[in-house]
């Protein structure tokens, strides 16, 4: 999504409001939506806050409830080498222990299990470890005067979740639609109501901090005048950071924050340190920074940003410009934050230290990846014309309008080159795992609706599988068996994606759906909008588990279930890439997501039912999960409440919606972020053996102050794209920072298995960068793998790392211009020649081939920023 490349903040709001009005008045959404951001933009990302007065900056206030870290001196002298002082936090927003489910819900009777629970972050330091929120803002609040955290995410988890007592309700999207693609008559009401509630909240926000404190001295004319001056011409805090010397692998210091009026201050960490470290800030502005192990081993530099605010002191105004805070929404465009806060970036330099743990588990899964539609096509490869994406990229209208930029026939031809590719992956790259996908439309080019599974209580029987076998294209079934055989012959473990976006055209006819659904008419083959698609997907998943269970143990059922809600249902030309069916119908996104979740859960159960053969000794017969694309959003301006709210809302929805649904059983069907009893579904919970994390970069957000698009209550701003010429920007115009990977890994690690305590295992199923010159990729690979190593060294259960991609391929609507591969490909040569990218291959293979299963110091010295 490249929205901010084309439109600025105000222009973006105008575009969004225009889309919203159009949708509401005839192209609308039936879902109720609500602005659930906090009472104040300043607090909206705060999991907790650290509050102090500048007059007591060196001592902890009496009666404080904080459990922040010890003083810098004691921390530096007592913490052991590489001790975890902060793991970056487990949440993307302001969840706390009080927000956790009160009891552990149970699994449905079919497979009784205790309910999985999400671990909330804590501010308590235990054995020198403290979690810091990894959302757009993170802080610790101990002042009784401080505002209560009431962000979008805080409210989503404020109600106790108890699936064991939740009534079993039918999982549907609430609406008055007569058919799935119809317009809902309540659209105008919900749209206008949502805008009004956003404006009302914005009006009340400045008063959320409470009344100002009265004069401290006996009341006289002079003290009254001084008090008036203090409240109307309040000074903004200033910062003068002081950094102490490094000790035991830790860097301590103080932000040196002073409030000219003696107001208590709150300290809020924005995201995580850029280059992969962790930081904690206490109530006095003392910070403790820990570098990732790789940086500690060779030295380097990192930076983090902290927002210092005096807003918790109560209502006050920072001079004439400060009055802008009383202008709803627009005030933060004129004077962001009203002068209450200042953002301070601290740069830390790390001296190298010997004896640092740089190891990986000996059985760690090192892999590369590609996907069927993106890579199979090319000279000599049989064409598959039966998928929605094939129809989409060949559609004359799309080609004429420039909505698509490539066809699979010009691809790298992995369909025919699979054996030599497997050899390169193992021998040249040092991999032991290969991730790839099966194309549903190749296995079943025609409908499987004739196979009725309703007579088995909704499950797939052996007779059903045999009937499906009769409908399958046996040549293609054998082809994938041959591919898996080749992978194993090259000592590569298959990691197989059951569905990587594409659908058979009998499930989804994109061009017909585009016309009918945009007009609100019934569309029969509407993909995940159709109510029968989850059942058809269930059959397909059961079939591939039955057919390939003896060759495959590790299954990724769905690839990135959330991103298509933007590219498919807010496909504004030149603003958002157009994916089939290319609608501007954001109101349909919830139907899409709910049906995906239904299909995933049914597939999960079927794959465990039909894959009972262990293909690799020591592994479970079926290790089943999903691949979650995760983008940590940060406020473009950390002191602007609009930006903070936009980042919070994005993080709570984009990174958490799907795991909340299939791990916790909370299916937020109207996407409003507010948990209600009818959204709790025990039958959906605990359907995961691992979570795939897919991370490419972070995302600064410019906020609107409202959610202007009906159906998208979580979209309160637009992302800021970077220039590809910047050293930390990809060719996809996305900022790249290793700290963002830590952020999303901590989110993923906060989810628990059915026992409520064991972390859901993580598999990094995609990580990569579009880099045509291969100049940024080597450093990107090394630094992101270094974050993975650091997380493992400090206790996180991560099973593997997969680089995307093995070879340059068709990047969906963007065509072939974005080059992610470790190899290029020349489709004009008969052998589809693979062109190696030496610097990147050298960097990654030096790690994967290391005989000690460790990060080589020589490679770290080349690529860690500022290495000595």
Predicted regions and their residues:
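Glycine-rich anion/phosphate-binding loops
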Residues: 408-420, 469-479, 529-542
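Active-site region of glycoside hydrolase catalytic domains
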Residues: 356-363, 367-391, 477-478, 485-775, ...
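Short coil/turn motif common to extracellular beta-sandwich-like domains
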Residues: 246-252
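Composition-driven, intrinsically disordered low-complexity tracts enriched in small residues
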Residues: 1-236, 240, 250, 313-349, ...
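Extracellular acidic loop/turn motifs
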Residues: 258-266
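Aromatic-lined substrate-binding rim segments of carbohydrate-active enzymes
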Residues: 418-503, 590, 596-608, 622
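Acidic, turn/loop-rich segments in luminal/extracellular domains of secretory-pathway
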Residues: 255-257, 271-350
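N-terminal structural segment of carbohydrate-active enzymes
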Residues: 355-470
């Amino acid at each position: 999504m490249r929205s901010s490349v084309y439109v600025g903040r105000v222009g973006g709001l105008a575009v969004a409001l225009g889309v919203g009005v159009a949708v509401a008045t005839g192209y609308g959404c039936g879902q109720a939506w609500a602005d659930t951001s906090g009472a104040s933009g300043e607090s909206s990302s705060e999991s907790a806050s650290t509050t102090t007065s500048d007059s007591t900056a060196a001592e902890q206030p009496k009666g404080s409830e904080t459990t922040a870290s010890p003083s810098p001196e004691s921390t530096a002298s007592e913490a052991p080498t590489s001790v975890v002082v902060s793991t970056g936090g487990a949440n993307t927003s302001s969840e706390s222990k009080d927000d956790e489910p009160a009891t552990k819900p149970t699994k449905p009777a079919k497979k009784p299990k205790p309910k999985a629970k999400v671990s909330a972050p804590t501010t308590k330091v235990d054995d020198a470890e403290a979690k810091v929120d990894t959302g757009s803002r993170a802080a610790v609040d101990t002042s009784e005067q401080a505002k209560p955290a009431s962000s979008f995410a805080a409210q989503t988890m404020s109600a106790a979740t108890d699936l064991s007592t939740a009534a079993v309700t039918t999982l549907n999207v609430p609406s008055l639609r007569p058919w799935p693609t119809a317009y809902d008559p309540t659209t105008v009401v919900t749209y206008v109501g949502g805008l009004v509630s956003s404006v009302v909240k914005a009006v009340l926000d400045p008063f959320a901090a409470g009344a100002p404190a009265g004069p401290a001295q006996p009341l006289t004319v002079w003290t009254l005048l001084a008090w008036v001056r203090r409240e109307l011409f309040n000074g903004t805090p200033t910062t003068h950071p002081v950094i102490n010397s490094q000790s035991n692998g830790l860097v301590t210091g103080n932000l040196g924050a002073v409030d000219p009026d003696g107001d208590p201050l709150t300290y809020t960490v924005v995201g995580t340190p850029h280059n992969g470290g962790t930081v904690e800030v206490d109530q006095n502005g003392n910070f403790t920074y820990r570098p990732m192990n790789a940086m500690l081993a060779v030295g380097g530099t990192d930076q983090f940003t902290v927002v210092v605010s005096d807003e918790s002191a109560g209502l006050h105004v920072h001079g004439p410009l400060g009055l802008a805070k009383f202008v709803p929404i627009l005030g933060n465009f004129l004077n962001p934050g009203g002068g209450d806060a200042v953002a301070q970036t601290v740069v830390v330099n790390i001296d190298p230290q010997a004896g640092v743990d740089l190891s990986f588990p000996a059985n760690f899964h090192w892999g590369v990846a590609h996907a069927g539609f993106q890579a199979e096509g090319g000279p000599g490869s049989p064409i598959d014309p039966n998928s929605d994406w094939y129809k989409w990229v060949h559609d004359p209208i799309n080609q004429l309008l420039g909505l698509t930029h490539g066809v699979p026939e010009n691809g790298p031809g992995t369909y025919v080159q699979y054996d030599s590719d497997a050899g390169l992956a193992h021998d040249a790259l040092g991999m032991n795992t290969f991730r790839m996908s099966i194309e549903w439309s190749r296995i079943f080019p025609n409908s499987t609706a004739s196979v009725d599974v309703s007579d088995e209580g909704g499950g797939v029987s052996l007779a059903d599988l045999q009937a499906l076998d009769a409908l399958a294209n046996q040549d293609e079934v054998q082809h994938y068996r041959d591919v898996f055989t080749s992978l194993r012959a090259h000592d590569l473990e298959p990691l197989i994606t059951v569905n990587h976006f594409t659908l058979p055209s009998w499930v989804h006819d994109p061009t017909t759906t585009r016309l009918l659904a945009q007009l609100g008419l019934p569309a029969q083959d509407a993909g995940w909008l159709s109510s029968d698609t989850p059942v058809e997907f269930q059959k397909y998943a059961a079939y591939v588990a039955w057919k390939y269970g003896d060759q495959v143990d590790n299954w990724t059922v769905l690839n990135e279930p959330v991103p298509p809600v933007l590219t498919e249902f807010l496909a504004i030309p030149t603003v958002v890439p157009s994916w089939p069916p290319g609608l501007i119908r954001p109101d349909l996104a919830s139907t899409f997501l709910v049906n995906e979740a239904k299909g995933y859960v049914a597939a999960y159960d079927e794959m465990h039912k039909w894959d009972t053969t262990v293909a690799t000794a020591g592994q479970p017969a079926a290790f089943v999960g999903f691949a979650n694309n995760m983008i940590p959003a940060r406020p473009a301006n950390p002191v602007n409440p609009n930006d903070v709210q936009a980042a919070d809302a994005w993080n709570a929805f984009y990174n958490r919606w799907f795991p909340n649904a299939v791990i916790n059983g909370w299916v937020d069907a109207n996407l409003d972020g507010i948990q209600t009893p009818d959204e709790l579904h025990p039958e959906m919970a605990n359907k995961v053996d691992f979570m795939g994390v897919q991370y490419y970069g972070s995302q600064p957000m410019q906020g609107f102050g409202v959610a202007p698009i009906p159906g998208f209550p979580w979209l309160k701003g637009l992302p800021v794209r970077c220039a590809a010429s910047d050293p930390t920007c990809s060719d996809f115009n996305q900022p790249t920072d290793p700290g963002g990977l830590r952020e999303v890994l901590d989110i993923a690690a906060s989810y628990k298995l059915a026992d409520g305590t064991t972390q859901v295992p993580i598999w990094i199923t995609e990580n990569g960068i579009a880099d045509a010159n291969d100049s940024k990729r080597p450093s990107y690979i090394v630094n992101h793998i270094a974050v993975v190593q650091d997380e493992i060294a400090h206790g996180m259960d991560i099973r593997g790392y997969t680089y995307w991609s093995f070879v340059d391929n068709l990047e969906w609507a963007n065509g072939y211009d974005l080059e992610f591969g470790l190899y290029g490909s020349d489709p004009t040569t008969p052998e589809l020649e693979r062109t190696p990218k030496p610097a990147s291959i050298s960097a990654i293979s030096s790690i994967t081939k290391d005989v000690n299963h460790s990060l080589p110091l020589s490679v770290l010295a080349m690529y860690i920023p500022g290495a000595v």
